[in-house]
């Protein structure tokens, strides 16, 4: 599977400017809690899919979109199955909102911004 190496799995997440600010406020170490209308946190398995969301969804919705890349301990992700959201390249994990703190604890290193769209 793409993004896998040893004990960690590389994931991506497209974010808008508001979520990026909250990530920056964490020292680039954590994703913010989900809003009440967001019951699931969706990190994706490919940079290509994250770029598509950031460019095609985040930019029209909020004026800019960013792609973040980060590594998560494989042992944490083994508790979740990969979900297909549409096409075969649209793969993501569905992490319940109440488990975002545990997800953040499983992040290894910093969250990096790897692309920006306006």
Question: Which functions belong to the PLM regions below?
Answer:
Residues 1-29, 34-42, 48-118:
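Conserved NAD+-utilizing ADP-ribose enzyme module
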